[in-house]
């Protein structure tokens, strides 16, 4: 018999310990990551118990009449004990739907965890949601490099990497608070110029998250004439490197500085990781593909994996 308990602060230690020993021990599900922006979202995370034993967690927030997994995270979905099997997640999903209906929820928006982030197979949730009539509402194209068997880069990309080296660009990992703020300022200038947008995180927030998770969050910057002209904020998971942010100013694009950053990241993590996820190249819930952006990512040897969102409407 599955019972649901809504997460509260007193459960933080239990939550975090469960994450560490789950099929998906991803640091961004740690409460110290999830709660850095708790003022922006009404948290409604859930804990699932089977005969008083915790078997699954579900990071969620509520907005109006929707339960969403989770708007403050790249993706969410059930985080399962390694002992959990299909029938248990079927039961958890049934209880989730009953819980949602009891709260007057009209829609569950479910951003499931892409399979490359699983340390053990963990798609019981997709099958369980299918049984309850869930439909795909969003498909976003992300470009992923197989680090153990990368595809060849074209000559043009290699020449840009060589040019950056000739121009004296040096890639360094930076750790200071001010470095993160400087990089996010660069990111915002680029986003504003090309997309009329700003970064999801502020520089202060990224510096805070780095201080909380220094082994998982890294800033690699291209330095040219003592200035950051390009860089990447990298999230490091068990078998995946995710390029959370990429930015390059006009000079960096001219001399291949960001190309060098990405090339060095590939070489650095190739011995220990399986995948490099360079992120999504879609807009408008996946309906618009930025062909220039995805082409650039593909030129490093990446190909498409998708991020899917499912919905159940009551």
What name fits each language-model region?
Residues 2-51, 55-66, 114-252:
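A conserved beta-strand-loop-helix scaffold within acyl/acetyltransferase catalytic domains
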Residues 41-43, 102-105, 217, 271-273:
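Short, high-confidence coil segments that cap the C-terminus of an alpha-helix
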Residues 63-79:
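A short glycine/small-residue-enriched secondary-structure motif
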Residues 64, 93-100, 130-131:
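Short, charged beta->alpha transition segments
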Residues 101, 130, 165, 270, ...:
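Anion (oxyanion) recognition and catalysis
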Residues 112-115, 280-281:
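Short, well-ordered beta-to-alpha junction loops that form the rim of enzyme active sites
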């Amino acid at each position: 018999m599955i019972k649901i308990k809504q997460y509260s602060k007193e459960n933080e230690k239990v939550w975090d310990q469960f994450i560490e020993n789950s099929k998906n021990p991803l640091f961004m599900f740690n409460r110290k990551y999830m709660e850095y922006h708790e003022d922006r979202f009404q948290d409604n995370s859930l804990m699932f118990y089977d005969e008083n034993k915790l078997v699954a967690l579900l990071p969620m927030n509520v907005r109006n009449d929707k339960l969403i997994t989770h708007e403050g995270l790249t993706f969410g979905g059930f985080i399962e004990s390694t002992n959990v099997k299909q029938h248990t997640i079927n039961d958890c999903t049934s209880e989730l739907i009953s819980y949602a209906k009891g709260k007057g929820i009209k829609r569950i928006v479910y951003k499931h965890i892409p399979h490359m982030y699983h340390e053990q197979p963990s798609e019981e949730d997709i099958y369980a949601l299918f049984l309850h009539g869930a439909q795909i509402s969003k498909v976003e194209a992300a470009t992923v490099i197989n680090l153990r068997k990368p595809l060849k880069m074209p000559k043009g990309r290699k020449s840009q990497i060589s040019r950056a080296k000739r121009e004296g660009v040096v890639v360094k990992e930076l750790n200071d608070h001010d470095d993160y703020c400087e990089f996010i300022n660069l990111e915002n200038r680029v986003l504003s110029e090309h997309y009329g947008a700003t970064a999801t995180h502020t520089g202060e927030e990224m510096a805070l998250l780095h201080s909380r998770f220094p082994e998982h969050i890294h800033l690699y910057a291209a330095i040219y004439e003592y200035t950051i002209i390009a860089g990447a904020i990298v999230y490091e998971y068990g078998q995946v490197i995710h390029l959370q942010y990429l930015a390059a100013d006009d000079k960096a694009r001219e001399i291949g500085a960001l190309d060098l950053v990405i090339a060095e990241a590939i070489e650095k993590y190739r011995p220990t990781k399986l995948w490099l996820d360079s992120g999504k190249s879609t807009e408008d819930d996946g309906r618009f593909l930025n062909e220039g952006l995805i082409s650039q990512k593909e030129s490093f040897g990446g190909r498409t994996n998708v991020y899917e969102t499912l919905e159940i409407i009551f």
